[in-house]
Amino acid sequence: MGHSGREERIKDIFKELTSKELTPGLLLTLQKLAQKPNTNLEQFIASCKALTKLSSNNPIIFNELLELLKNKSEEDSTGPKKIAPSINKRKKFKIQLDLDDNEDELDSPVQKKPAPTRTLFKRIDKLKAKQLRQYSPTVKDPSPNSEQQTQNGHAETKDYEPTRSEVVEEDREWYDNDDDYGNLVPEPLSELPEEAKLLPVIRNIDNDDALRNTVQLYPIPLKQRMEWIPPFLSKFALENKVPTSIIIGSISETSSQVSALSMVNPFRNPDSEFSANAKRGSKLVALRRINMEHIQQSRDNTTVLNTAMGEVLGLENNNKAKDKSNQKICDDTALFTPSKDDIKHTKEQLPVFRCRSQLLSLIRENQVVVIIGETGSGKTTQLAQYLYEEGYANDRGKSIVVTQPRRVAAISVAKRVAMEMQVPLGKEVGYSIRFEDVTDSECTKLKFVTDGILLRETLLDDTLDKYSCVIIDEAHERSLNTDILLGFFKILLARRRDLKLIITSATMNAKKFSAFFGNAPQFTIPGRTFPVQTIYTSNPVQDYVEAAVSQAVKIHLANDCSSGDILIFMTGQEDIETTFDTLQEKFLQVYSKKFGTANFEEINDIEILPIYSALPADLQFKIFQDLHGTKRKIIIATNIAETSLTIKGIRYVIDCGYSKLKVYNPKIGLDSLVITPISKANADQRSGRAGRTAPGTAYRLYTEDTFKEDMYLQTIPEIQRTNLSNTLLLLKSLDVTDELSKFPFIDKPPLQTFLSSLYELWFIGAIDTSGQLTPLGLQMAKFPLQPSLSKILLIAVRNGCSDEMLTIVSMLSVPQVFYRPKERQKEADIARNKFFIAKSDHLTLLNVFEQWRANNFSSHWCNKHFVQYKSLVRARDIRDQLLTILKSQKIPVISSGKDWDIIKKCICSGFAHQAAKITGLRNYVHLKTGVSVQLHPTSALHGLGDLPPYVVYHELLMTSKEYICCVTSVDPFWLMEYGGLLYDIKRIKNDQEATTTGLFGEHYEHTLDKVEDDIDINIRRCKDMRDSVIQELKMTDNSNKEDKKQKTKKQNILNGKENSMKPFKRRKPFF
């Protein structure tokens, strides 16, 4: 077998063993293993398993691979020896744009560059040859211009249109999440910031393994970094008597003072049994998760889907039946338009109708009113109509705006109000969310928006002059944007006395809102609630899912179906699905013993219905259907059913006492979704669901002592448990106060989160050493993106890769791109792997979008390759929005072609503070904090044989472990260039560079050590850059001290404290 044939056979064998790519580094390692004389077949197989994931254990294949590697090693060793400069080992990648939907599989997106022929040179010094080999110039292919530009008008999908059942099965998470950024700011941008202009054009740096092993990065000690804090933060810390260590974050800092300034602990009593059970989670859920993994492994080994045997077994028919059932659901949910009389009758039955005149009178007499009303009182849909009828929208072209914390609420309420007013949606009544503006600037009088949209509108008009009345709905949810809006209006109302502000809330937080606005009057809409009996458990339950299932079965067996429906509160989707499955199993056991029932579908008096945000809208609709007492609905819901939904017929509530809360740790920059105890206010809201239509009963799966001692009075506001960098950048650009610390927060954020967010903005160049916005920061605030994403986009503009960066930033702004259906997880994993770009998840996302664009944005292509169609559509919308901003400034959008190192360095410029360094074979450690982290299993780097030494990541998430998500390999010199205040760099001397010892112990250095090579030059350049930043910090600090001294002297003169009779100077102490 020839040399080329042997190499092809090795690659074929490797493809049979694993789906991962055979990289040159991994191939070299395998050759070295095969060369060892004492390596037998078992040892070789074990070594291969340690290096990468394998899908086969066939010893025959491994034996063939071992022999081929031995022969290849011998051939390489007997070949002619040539001395030549090292070629560039970095792989060049090319996005494949010629894929066709008719092809069964994707071509590999990674194209290996053919090795150029080596040139013979004369023999030189061994050390000099090694240096030449390590630092030879990078061989670059010519970069063509952009192959394809994004068009505003997108190609229509000609080959396939999704059915309605497919559309409703798409992920609904985007519509149910908060709107953080809002719509496009059409204000024209000023010139490109000076910081972006002055950035050096990024040149490729050869990320050769030898170079990376020659230098090492280390975190700069905390004590040293504390000396490099910008003066405005040091001054703030000094004035507030807080340690400067909280500004930069330290996981080793455990003092009581620092703990009081850090994030709010989501557990009021962390040592209680109730809190411990929350941290452990449900055993039943964990057991189900393990069983599902075992079932999936069995399916993977014996899969018959889409085969002749699969058709015999009916697998394909089951999928078709599922589609039919989905279609049936869609038919059941067909919308109807009620008559005018029906609408009038429904509106008059609402509790708010009976107090209409008193409510409007109170609004006329006061600038701010707090309205308290339970879910179902009609405050959300009726209040805006009452104000419209009173003429608040007729004044000089002004309109009424209503904010909602969720997109789906803004859309649904706008549709309902338009139907009740019998006007077309988008005319008199409209809504505006990100990427959807269904309004008419001339005739829209009632506008429903997300709180993020209204917050972004303040950038265009800081007086909101076009609105006569603002309604902040569902304010008790205390979303971050709602809290910022409340602080903004507290400042604005003093300037606009004609503006009316109405805050609607459930009973929780109403007093706080009133006190915040100077004891504004409160108005309570009389409810129609009935008494609810609350029953606690006598002892703490060990498994809340098991206890909830048991209680639901008891209620159903002890009470007739006509007595009412059951609502079970759970923490999230996994808990809900486990409860759903376990309820079916338990009821089947009972009914099989009593009636001989063979399967759950034969039980005709129970309907179990889940409800959570990611569930398709048509399935969510089923919980509102009236079953007329023939069946009992058992609804399993998250806290979305506390206030956002009104479900008729609920008479029994089962409350597990927990919910999932997203918590941010500023010490390590970690977002984590944790199960925590609910608040007392949440518990009362849940219990109240049982008394909306008749007297009810609430079963609390915790003791009364737990309610009193382990639960906070109110839910922790989002502003006290989230990163504030984007919010603070927005407030800086609004310039509402001289200092951000003086902004009127209704609940102040933790001081550590506040200061660490400001430090992050300074670190990435958004604010200067005096705390003011830089030109770059001013431009960053114009983009509806997180600050780091805004920066990498602006840096990419200067470095000629803005076309690719537009796509990457857009893809990072949407939910999960890939999906794994339970019945086809192995197929989904294989399809996802084909998109992988080695050592970069960011470039993998770019690859996915480019492949989709090459296939005319086809939904059929997405379904075929297990890609979320709706996520890609959202990414395309975001990309168009950002492209419009760039084009309005006449900034060219340029492609870097094949040169992807430029893109990676631009990514590093915004995420240098989020870097990790490899330790051991497969683990990473956070380079700044020292926390051990792992690659997320969905990463393109996960399972690689040779992992890169340094990476940057987009997100750090904690589930069962600390995972870094969306990772890209970077050069250590890039990290030094953009993170020089966090890291130090050192050169590791090899054997030839080590000193030698003479006969009498004297040391002699190698003469070539004195010659400065490229690595030494780059190290010195990085340190010089850091020294210049430190010098600037010192100069600013000294200037501030001098200004303060002059100001004090001037004040003393004005106060008459300085006169000619000066006392003798005191002798300065010696210490």
Swiss-Prot record:
Family the entry assigns: Belongs to the DEAD box helicase family. DEAH subfamily. PRP16 sub-subfamily.
Biased composition (Acidic residues): 168-180
Effect of Y386D: Suppressor phenotype
Extent of motif DEAH box: 473-476
Name this protein carries in UniProt: Pre-mRNA-splicing factor ATP-dependent RNA helicase PRP16
Species: Saccharomyces cerevisiae (strain ATCC 204508 / S288c)
InterPro entries referenced in this protein's UniProt entry, alphabetically: DEAD-box_helicase_OB_fold, DEAD/DEAH_box_helicase_dom, DNA/RNA_helicase_DEAH_CS, HA2_WH, Helicase-assoc_dom, Helicase_ATP-bd, Helicase_C-like, P-loop_NTPase
Span of domain Helicase ATP-binding: 360-526
EC identifiers of the protein: 3.6.4.13
Record's keyword terms, sorted: ATP-binding, Helicase, Hydrolase, mRNA processing, mRNA splicing, Nucleotide-binding, Nucleus
Biological role stated in the UniProt entry: Influences the fidelity of branchpoint recognition in yeast splicing. This is RNA-dependent ATPase which is essential for viability. It may mediate one of the many ATP-requiring steps of spliceosome assembly and that accuracy of branchpoint recognition may be coupled to ATP binding and/or hydrolysis.
Subcellular locations according to the entry: Nucleus
GO molecular function: 3'-5' RNA helicase activity; ATP binding; ATP hydrolysis activity; ATP-dependent activity, acting on RNA; RNA binding
